[in-house]
Amino acid sequence: MDNKKKDKDKSDDRMARPSGRSGHSTRGTGSSSSGVLMVGPNFRVGKKIGCGNFGELRLGKNLYTNEYVAIKLEPMKSRAPQLHLEYRFYKQLGSGDGIPQVYYFGPCGKYNAMVLELLGPSLEDLFDLCDRTFSLKTVLMIAIQLISRMEYVHSKNLIYRDVKPENFLIGRPGNKAQQVIHIIDFGLAKEYIDPETKKHIPYREHKSLTGTARYMSINTHLGKEQSRRDDLEALGHMFMYFLRGSLPWQGLKADTLKERYQKIGDTKRATPIEVLCENFPEEMATYLRYVRRLDFFEKPDYDYLRKLFTDLFDRKGYMFDYEYDWIGKQLPTPVGAVQQDPALSSNREAHQHRDKIQQSKNQSADHRAAWDSQQANPHHLRAHLAADRHGGSVQVVSSTNGELNTDDPTAGRSNAPITAPTEVEVMDETKCCCFFKRRKRKTIQRHK
């Protein structure tokens, strides 16, 4: 099998967005007299399109508007309930470009349910579709957007702590935001500004590993408390993953998961930035050097980082036209495959984004203005609660409930702790959370 695919053990399905009335309801819903499962007054529950430790993801439909939505169902008796926390974080984020809309949260029979906007494929799915390499133009269009996306999250006093390609989705094909890169899954997010004191959280060590090992920062491997710098470093690792097709620390074997994560961290530290970014524009190395030198408390200069890539983009003569590498390819969706027509890219959106780029270029490199908090729109509900819910220096905290994805072929995620020596060969550093079922690959078979 092709080497590019060797280290890719992923499973799980997922993601979401809906339409209709927004709300947080305590009114119980469930099966109607016709036997149709309903969430709230107007969302009909359909087929299963994803699963994980949180429960299930279902395709839904707003019966008032006939628009498709995604519905996350979590058993009320869940050992580690987290759906209400995710809802609260979405509310805290409010309205912003590339932030999924949440339309409803409340009980549904024996489940808690959250209705979200239905989105398109994840960057990991699109990476597969493009033979596991993105062009420089596509990576730069992604990077420019995701720096802004992370700046917005940070402006809401949250750090994300879960960077991975599966957590960044394009809009649903045919939607006006179809080419916008969205950020999803705030199950590992945390408030870095104490809501009581309004001060930055203190620097601490001996913390549990939180996030996805393939992309997490070097300081996270060292057990240091995460802050804004770590989100940006993880993004840098993901950008190089897209350009290279793989990272030097993928596919490492060990007798235990703890040893494997130690090896990943050791290899990251031992890989010079110049080697990691060899044969690619110097701006990629400059980005990583900058974010790795940030102080724990320091506010990153997002404008400087964006300008690095927008200037490179201009020098290459690229147009920010949303002509990604996957344009023209057939995109899978939970409601049928869709041909991605280049003509669907909105000229108006392209002009708007170019205007934003020009605006960014005109700002000085040392400008450190925060994202305008006035963008929040009260009718867009999103949310999650900031809480460092997972302890233990040997635990790698993964999406939604702090457990590891060991490429479970049935549920997509596993409850195995990091200390468990079983299935090391099929353990993946990533946690899949795209909105539709992905083809499962077993690392054991690939490494034979």
Curated annotation (Swiss-Prot):
Biased composition (Polar residues): 395-417
Binding site for ATP: I49, G50, C51, G52, N53, F54, G55, E56, L57, K72
CC annotations in GO: cytoplasm; nucleus; plasma membrane
GO aspect biological process, one term: signal transduction
Region (Disordered): 1-35, 342-375, 392-417
GO molecular function: ATP binding; protein serine kinase activity; protein serine/threonine kinase activity
Modified residue annotations for N-acetylmethionine: M1
Pfam families: CK1gamma_C, Pkinase
Keywords recorded for this protein, A-Z: Acetylation, ATP-binding, Cytoplasm, Kinase, Nucleotide-binding, Phosphoprotein, Serine/threonine-protein kinase, Transferase, Wnt signaling pathway
EC number(s) on file: 2.7.11.1
Modification Phosphoserine, positions: S414
Active site, renumbered: D162
Subunit record text: Monomer.
Function text: Serine/threonine-protein kinase. Casein kinases are operationally defined by their preferential utilization of acidic proteins such as caseins as substrates. It can phosphorylate a large number of proteins. Participates in Wnt signaling. Regulates fast synaptic transmission mediated by glutamate.
Extra information: Triazolodiamine 1 is a commercial name for 5-amino-3-([4-(aminosulfonyl)phenyl]amino)-N-(2,6-difluorophenyl)-1H-1,2,4-triazole-1-carbothioamide.
Record protein name field: Casein kinase I isoform gamma-3
Organism: Rattus norvegicus
Annotated gene: Csnk1g3
